[in-house]
Each structure stands twice: as structure tokens, then as C-alpha cells.
Amino acid sequence: MSMSSIPSSSQSGKLYGWVERIGNKLPHPFLLFIYLIIVLMVTTAILSAFGVSAKNPTDGTPVVVKNLLSVEGLHWFLPNVIKNFSGFAPLRAILALVLGAGLAERVGLLPALMVKMASHVNARYASYMVLFIAFFSHISSDAALVIMPPMGALIFLAVGRHPVAGLLAAIAGVGCGFTANLLIVTTDVLLSGISTEAAAAFNPQMHVSVIDNWYFMASSVVVLTIVGGLITDKIIEPRLGQWQGNSDEKLQTLTESQRFGLRIAGVVSLLFIAAIALMVIPENGILRDPINHTVMPSPFIKGIVPLIILFFFVVSLAYGIATRTIRRQADLPHLMIEPMKEMAGFIVMVFPLAQFVAMFNWSNMGKFIAVGLTDILESSGLSGIPAFVGLALLSSFLCMFIASGSAIWSILAPIFVPMFMLLGFHPAFAQILFRIADSSVLPLAPVSPFVPLFLGFLQRYKPDAKLGTYYSLVLPYPLIFLVVWLLMLLAWYLVGLPIGPGIYPRLS
């Protein structure tokens, strides 16, 4: 069945069809990044030959593009090829997480858990459930981007709905809403530190706390859950039509063995969480900062991903033994090998992606583009609401081409934070604008390592899906999320509500 079932007379149907056709003409991601590397090399050579540079408005230093085709570029590239690949942070994190999450899936824990959760939810509200769980999963940082999409598909299968709709709803929650959190997470810590440093250029006493965006971001979870659910139910799933997959994939009932396994896994989960809590909650807890005894930052926050992997391993092992999925010691490595095999295509794709990102950074093209575009926005004299929209759109554009959100904010914050402070706005308010833009376009960013991962998840249920298919399906979420989120922030600003404890959009 075609993914695009809206009649051709529908303008939205024509748009999705156009996106799918254009996207499907794109080469395989591996080749796409090879071509991008060639374009990048030629571009740096031309800009370098003509001595083109940009002036950093914060300190007046020139931002010069370095020539990748020069002798200097060759001397940098050859010794760093392997380092660029093996040191690519998302690759390390994703492969490690797949060991844990893949084991949980292979022993049957995740499917059984999703069936258990879905059994208490009416199929009508499955979209909202998936989105809410996805938002809550942000506590696991990038791990959520790996774990939640397959979970979303399984939940929809369990309630008899189209798994691709559940997959896309989960991608929207963990991707488009990546920085919307009920709890304080690592993103708050990272971005607030960058904002504080940027604000110091204007006011050395200004400090952006990790909780300065909390009220707005927690409220965003509620709004975006409703919006995302409506998009899934009213736009996405009608386009997919009736699920024609194997009926055996509809996980509708649990065996007594699975129920027993879930009970054992639940007990082990509680014991694991209690053990971690004993190392974090007490003031002298061993996972707190050894000097300041704080939770943020602390070894606990820095080690959240390894702890998640260990959690999956321990709980999956308990479930597997209880259900006799794991009968011998040799079963354990075999169960962990299978999900790693599925990552082969992702690993191959990451090689040119990692080289492209490293070359983009070394050549200063990222800084050059960011400074040039921000100069245009600054020189146009935009202020107030136009400045809000300008920063959001600029950030969205840059996030499409630079994989690291923190890297982009490191470039933009020294320019826009002082600029917004001069206009009378709190730096935490500028930070929210960036977070909205960064999150909204994450599932679309061609340089994101998660896009091919999401495509791989989609191909489980639609083997002939290509990049264009993926883009045409996921497109409504980024577009609508960005507009709704900005309107929500505008309303927040006009009403004068606090964006965090004691923090308002405008400086007092």
C-alpha cells in the first residue's frame, strides 16, 4: 500500500507527494555525504583562495575559512580519518545503547512491556500515550532517540493500529520535542552553561540556571502531546491506510510466562532504582559531585547513559531467565549479537557522516555561515517579536546542517544573548527560542545521525521506504510543532508568565 493515500486533488497530498518524489531522488545517505564532502572541499578552496572571511561581532576576530584541499588540510585529514570515525560520539552512544535495548527486545521484555502498558489504554488515546512517554524518556538523553521509536510502533501494534503511525508519533516526541521535559535533564545543564558564559560579556553577574526554562518546557510537554496526538490521528494515520502486515505481529495477549517475567523484571527494576537512589539522594552519595556534593553536575548525570545500559542489561537478564528465553550462558551473547547486525547499515553510513562533520568543523565553515547569517539579522535592526522569529528561523536553518545543537548554540549564544539582553530580555528567554528551533527540525536534519536510524526503523514495516518516504511522512510534525511552539512562547511573553522559578522573559 502506498504511504501517500490522500487524493491527488488535495493540496497537502500534492505537497507530501512532491516531498516524497524529490526525497527519493536523493542518493543513499552514504553517497549523499560523499557528495557533500566534495562540495565542502571545493567551497573551502574557493573561499580561501579569495580570502573571504567574516568578523565575529563579539570580539572582532576574523573567522577565516580553512582550505580542505590545501597541504594543511591534507596534513590534518589523513591522521584524523580513523579518529573522526571512532571518536564520533553518537556512534559510540548508539552502539552501546543497542547492546542494552537490543537485548531487552530480543528476550521479549520490551514487546511484553508495551503490551502490558497498551492493555490499559484505549486505542483511541494511543497517540497521546506514546507522545507523553516519549517526552518523559528525555531523561535518558540521546538514548530516547534509539529506544522510543520501536516502542511506539509496538504500542500501536498492540492496540491494533498502524505501527508506522506509532513510530512517527514517538519520533515526534523524542525528536521534535527533544528539549521539552518534565524533569531537569542534561540538555538544561549543557545549554545553561553556554548561555551563562555568553551573558557574561554583557553582565558578568548574570547567571542562567538549569531550571530557568523549567516552567515553559514542562508546560510544552502538555501542549505538544495534544498537538502531536492530533497530527498523528488526523493527518498521519489516515495517509497510511489499514495496516496490512502479518497479524502475528500484533502483540495482543501475554502468556503466563511473560506475566511472571514482567513481575520479576519489575522487582529487579525497583531494586536497581533503589540502589541508584541510595547513591544519589543522600548528601554524601557516592554518585554526587565529590567536591560540591551536587546532583547537577555529578558522576550520576555524566554517567546516565552507561547506567541506562546497565539497567537494560540487568532487567533483561532477569526477564530472560524468568521466561527461559535465556537458558544457557551462551544464549546471552547470541541475543546481543543479533541487534548489532541490524546496525551494520548505520555504521557504514556514519563513516562519511563523521568525516563530513569533522571537516565542516575544522574548516570553520560552520562558524563562517553562522556569523554571516547573524550579521545579516543583526544589521537589519530587528527587535521584539521579529527578532524572536528571526533567531528561531536562523537556528532552525543551522540545525539542519550542523549535527550538534550545543555546537550551534556555542556559536549563536555569544551574539544573540548579549543582543537580547540589550533589548531588555533575559538570556534564558533567548535560550528557549534556540531550544524550540533545535528540537523542531531534529527529525529533518540531513546531518543528524538519527535520520538514517529512523529510516531503518521505518523500513522494518515498509521495506521499500526511502529518504523521501520518511521525509514526506514526518514533515507535518516539525512544521506544526515549530509554529505552535513559537505561538505558545509568544503568548507566554505577552501574558508575562515566568519561564522558570523567578525568571521572566524580560529583565527586571
Write out the residue ranges for each language-model feature.
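Interfacial loop/helix-cap signal at membrane boundaries in integral membrane proteins
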Residues: 10, 14-15, 53-88, 201-209, ...
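Core transmembrane alpha-helical segments of multi-pass membrane transporters/permeases
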Residues: 26-34, 38, 62-111, 297-366
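Hydrophobic core segments of alpha-helical transmembrane domains in multi-pass membrane transport
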Residues: 33-48, 97-102, 133-137, 173-177, ...
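Membrane-interfacial loop-to-helix junctions in multi-pass transporters
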Residues: 72-73, 85-91, 118-129, 163-165, ...
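Hydrophobic alpha-helical transmembrane segments of multi-pass integral membrane proteins
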Residues: 94-95, 122-153, 158, 347-356, ...
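C-terminal transmembrane helix pair
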Residues: 121, 366, 380-507
